[in-house]
Curated annotation (Swiss-Prot):
Gene: apaG
Residue ranges of every copy of the ApaG domain listed in the record: 1-125
Purpose of the protein: Not known; mutations in apaG/corD give a phenotype of low-level Co(2+) resistance. They also decrease Mg(2+) efflux but not influx via the CorA Mg(2+) transport system.
Annotated source species: Salmonella typhimurium (strain LT2 / SGSC1412 / ATCC 700720)
A single GO BP: error-free translesion synthesis
Protein known as: Protein ApaG
PANTHER family membership: F-BOX ONLY PROTEIN 3 (PTHR14289), POLYMERASE DELTA-INTERACTING PROTEIN 2 (PTHR14289:SF16)
């Protein structure tokens, strides 16, 4: 979890065995992000950047507008939650990134999302 003066980000990931195919080096993960506005004014998420790294160190960058097709506006004390997915070639990997946001005055700020793990559960003891 990371906190800024205005926003708290929490991420949980889960392995999707039914959509994965280890024999084909295809490991599917879902991740759920909760964005909480801890400030006294609304904020809006405009864009995202992800760096996805597989277990061999191969990096993939993903960036774009909004998340899951929307640019949510989050009122003070409220939260926005969404689930998305990532596919990597190894049973273990990581994701990290940032969100580009604006406050009620239109001032831009960036919220870093620290590294979190994508892992097949049987690998972690």
């Amino acid at each position: 979890m990371i906190n800024s003066p205005r926003v708290c980000i929490q991420v949980q990931s889960v392995y999707i065995e039914a959509q994965s195919s280890p024999d084909d080096e295809r490991y599917v993960f879902a991740y759920t992000v909760t964005i909480r506005n801890l400030g006294r004014a609304p904020v809006q998420l405009l864009g995202r950047y992800w760096l996805i790294t597989n277990g061999h160190g191969r990096e993939t960058e993903v960036q774009g507008e909004g998340v899951v097709g929307v640019q949510p506006r989050i009122a003070p004390g409220e939260e926005y939650q969404y689930t998305s997915g990532a596919v990597i070639e190894t049973p273990l990997g990581t994701m990290q990134g940032h969100y580009e946001m604006i406050d009620e005055n239109g001032d831009a700020f960036t919220i870093d999302i620290p590294v979190f793990r994508l892992a097949v559960p049987t690998l972690i003891h």
